């Protein structure tokens, strides 16, 4: 009988947003099909992810590396990819179905060979598109030899999967140009669980009950404060905002946190605050701590990623100010549903002007709309049913 394997660096909601989604997928696969095995690493000193006891777990110990040192990180990924491969080789057989993601990238590179050697069916969940995403990150130049070589390599890797699950329609269009058979592509959007993420009054978020912010319109960035999120563009725009009602809250962690902290310290008007990283248990209070959610991507990220924070903000019933290229998945949702506003990336003047305008708007007409859009189109139930529908025919083929 064919079995299902999930192979992922993160498998628990207590780890990060990637772990959140994999935990939900794991639960659905186990309930729908049974016979599920999850292969994942456990870094020294890390809190173990919460995995259902009904799921067969193949966990391997993994030494902690310094993510800020390229050599240390590279060696760690090589070792991790090797351990993943050993575990999968010892368990998976012809006809089994293996689900994996695009990280770590070195593990992704081993899958075409493993699939050929072991004969399993491969479902790849695409959160990141390599090597295109290395260009806006400043790691590679598009006209470099390394980029062209990696593009050919990853086109081969993506084409080796039986099913490619993409999380945005812009990503789907990009991937059609990369793979040999576009019929392998399946669009399944990100989601948020409406039972776990729900609206909370802003005044109930204790950490933003700042006397100076009474009557302010709070714009919030919540999540990964990373290099691909267009952070510098937001910070530049904040300096240009003229409306005195505007206030800005940053919650999260990432490579550009120090830059956010620096701007907060230099902000003489005290309208920019950094609140650190929130525990998962407090996510609803964090999402409540604003009037408008800022969802941003760096210029050049079209088709390369979809911020999951947008779906959580919808569940929390917050309108969205999307700063990204036109036609990107979140920008497209806003155009289709009217749950917010769009602004092009890398244009702080335009962003500041739009923030000034939003500060003068009556937002009461948007009450209930973002959450309703999520419930009707981007609920957990809808997306997980699509995952089951994606895997089911592969299992049926294995029985023949």
From Swiss-Prot:
Coiled coil: none
SUPFAM superfamilies named in the record: UDP-Glycosyltransferase/glycogen phosphorylase
Domain of life: Bacteria
Name of a matching Pfam family: Glyco_trans_1_4
MF terms in GO: glycosyltransferase activity
GO biological process per UniProt: O antigen biosynthetic process
Pathway connected to this protein: Bacterial outer membrane biogenesis; LPS O-antigen biosynthesis
UniProt family annotation: Belongs to the glycosyltransferase group 1 family. Glycosyltransferase 4 subfamily.
Extra remark: The O-antigen locus is highly variable and differs considerably between different serogroups of Pseudomonas aeruginosa.
Protein name (Swiss-Prot/TrEMBL): Probable glycosyltransferase WbjE
Originating organism: Pseudomonas aeruginosa
Lineage, uppermost ranks: Bacteria, Pseudomonadati, Pseudomonadota, Gammaproteobacteria, Pseudomonadales
